[in-house]
Design a protein with these regions (language model features):
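Short, glycine/charged-enriched hinge/interface segments at domain edges or termini
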Residues: 1-106, 248-249, 286
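Glycine-rich loops and low-complexity Gly/Arg-rich segments
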Residues: 7-8, 22, 34-35, 57-59, ...
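Generic structural signal for well-ordered, non-membrane alpha-helical segments
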Residues: 15, 22-25, 40, 86-90, ...
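Flexible glycine/proline-rich
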Residues: 26, 148-286
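Helix-rich terminal scaffold detector
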Residues: 56-180, 184-189, 201
């Protein structure tokens, strides 16, 4: 209090009370942001405090999506016969690309016409850095994309995995071509195995998405391949657990298996069964 011009302190002041130490926020030579850091609200505030208003950043890569198949109809188009389906791959893949830091470009649906496949790929490559195609890579009579992709610098022609066995990866100069199967579940798994890794390296944001979890229940593997099985992730008594509740068995066309808090349980090629409560590797999707 102040009385007659005299300041009286009635309480003992703790040492360093209301004192900000020199260098408490950061010290000379300290690294505050590293290459590849994603700039959020805190990082931007830090740059503003330091007086940086022009900085060098990575240009977002453009991921193009080119879905193929005579059976496909786009959104808003009517299905003219029972053999036709609505295209969903381009929706899933474009949004996945955006969620992992890229800009997405969706090209018109490509028909199963051999003479149109290579020109469509070439045209798409002019507008994107990574081109993802879906369909046309399996063993069908009208699967023309596989031959077209093989004309480029082929890196991967096939993998012993399920789903996504017929995935192909090629390069055209500095650009990537990723040819995925037409089944939606397969294409979404293939994205996480390939496109996500490429984008992470491109943007210097590599991340390990594989963690350990305990399997609630058991699993019997029927294929001779390395499998990626849709599962639910939960926390139980401080442990990460997965289960297969509600996951439908069937073809690689089942989109809903990746809904909600899903992950991919990795079942090694040499395994046939996984016992209850066994510790397994799972791949997170985000």
């Amino acid at each position: 209090s102040v009385e007659n011009g005299v300041l009286t302190i009635h309480e003992k002041v703790p040492l360093n009370f209301a004192v900000r130490g020199v260098g408490e926020s950061y010290k000379k030579g300290e690294i505050l942001l590293t290459k590849g850091t994603k700039l959020g609200f805190s990082e931007l505030a830090l740059l503003a405090e330091l007086g940086f208003f022009h900085i060098s950043v990575f240009v977002k890569p453009v991921v193009g999506v080119l879905s193929s198949g005579d059976e496909l109809k786009d959104l808003g188009e009517s299905l003219d016969n029972p053999a036709q389906i609505r295209s969903s791959n381009h929706i899933a893949l474009a949004n996945l690309a955006k969620s992992f830091g890229a800009n997405a470009l969706v090209f018109p649906l490509l028909k199963d016409k051999k003479s149109e496949v290579k020109p469509a790929i070439q045209n798409a490559l002019e507008s994107c850095d990574i081109l993802i195609t879906t369909g046309g890579v399996s063993m069908g009579d009208f699967d023309f994309l596989k031959a077209a992709v093989r004309e480029y610098e082929l890196i991967i022609d096939k993998l012993d995995i399920k789903p996504g066995r017929h995935i192909k990866v090629a390069k055209s100069g500095k650009k990537f071509i990723l040819a995925f199967p037409g089944f939606p579940y397969s294409s979404m798994v293939a994205f996480h195995l390939s496109a996500r890794e490429i984008l992470g390296a491109w943007l210097c944001q590599k991340k390990d998405y594989i963690i350990k979890a305990f399997l609630k229940g058991s699993y019997a593997k029927k294929s001779p391949y390395l499998e990626f099985v849709a599962c639910n992730v939960e926390f139980e008594n401080g442990k990460v657990c997965v289960n297969l509740a509600g996951k439908k068995k069937g073809s690689s066309a089942i989109i809903s298996n990746l809904n909600y808090k899903s992950a991919l349980m990795i079942v090694p090629k040499e395994r046939t069964n996984i016992a209850e409560n066994e510790l397994v590797d799972i791949m997170l999707l985000s």
